[in-house]
Amino acid sequence: MEYIKSNKVVLIGDGAVGSSYAFALVAQGVADELVIIDLDEDKVKGDVMDLNHAAPYGGSPVKIKAGSYKACHNADLVVITAGAAQKPGETRLDLIEKNTKIFKSIVSEVMASGFNGIFLVATNPVDVLTYVTQQVSGLPKEKVIGSGTILDTARFKYELAEEFGVSDRSVHGQIIGEHGDSELAVWSQANIAGQPLYQLLIDDPEKQHRIEEIFVNTRDAAYDIIQAKGATYYGIAMGLVHITKAILNNQNVVLTVSSRLEGEYGQEDVYIGVPTKINRQGAVEVFEIPLNDEEKTLFTRSVGILKEMQNKISHLIA
């Protein structure tokens, strides 16, 4: 009998994002095996039961179970959504330091299992924690990927699609940089069927104000959702499944994930959201979008902010 390799995913973190990802993964039939790890074992037990009951109506058969870090040893992909949430009065730096310590522990446990697959990081601040994951794991940069600006790009496409009355799948545009306040829209390359959208907006006096509004709506969407319902999880969960499919199915698609730069865009030693080819080997190639002078300045600023954060937590992962 011919041996057929199965696709095994281990999910670390069964909170709102993690459980949403698990559901979407099962619904779309992306993996053959899903193992869920979380400190709240009762929550995992309940979700495993619930997901197994949903699986018969999913995309394809999948084995779902609770597990420990030992399950990572033969996993193709380890997805990390675990981490501390920001508390009232807590600074962003406090949160970064707290999650860096958590990640150092998680990644060390995963590597101790003999894991040699690909890490996919979603916990915020995602760019910095992806950097932490690569530093602690010692894996090649191709094997450590962050969700980056994949959700921001989806939000940007949604806003543009609404503005121009077309399907979001017909919109070509990217948000790059930090997944956060310093991200930027690559307006100079955004288009529908080759028509430059920035020019269409700037040439229409009644729509010029929409350029800033579209970007602000994109950048600040998370704040609006959090204010309305407490957290964001469906969008990022679907984005993570999209990346998962690209990896497990060797799709060679280009997605705006958090990748490590080594000279691209004139930058190095930083994880940041940029268009990257994703396949079974991981993040194999960064694509350099032509940026205008303003976009180059904004991107350099975003890199500087991320490097400053990396430097502030470097002593925790030395």
Curated annotation (Swiss-Prot):
Catalytic activity: (S)-lactate + NAD(+) = pyruvate + NADH + H(+)
InterPro entries: L-lactate/malate_DH (IPR001557), L-lactate_DH (IPR011304), L-lactate_DH_AS (IPR018177), Lactate/malate_DH_C (IPR022383), Lactate/malate_DH_N (IPR001236), Lactate_DH/Glyco_Ohase_4_C (IPR015955), NAD(P)-bd_dom_sf (IPR036291)
Entry annotation: catalytic residues: 179 (proton acceptor)
Gene Ontology MF annotations: L-lactate dehydrogenase activity
GO CC terms of this entry: cytoplasm
EC number: 1.1.1.27
Annotated NAD(+) binding sites: 17, 38, 43, 69, 83-84, 105, 122-124, 147
Binding-site positions, beta-D-fructose 1,6-bisphosphate: 157, 172
Matches recorded under Gene3D superfamilies: Lactate dehydrogenase/glycoside hydrolase, family 4, C-terminal, NAD(P)-binding Rossmann-like Domain
Top EC group: oxidoreductase
A single GO BP: glycolytic process
Protein name: L-lactate dehydrogenase
Gene source species: Staphylococcus saprophyticus subsp. saprophyticus (strain ATCC 15305 / DSM 20229 / NCIMB 8711 / NCTC 7292 / S-41)
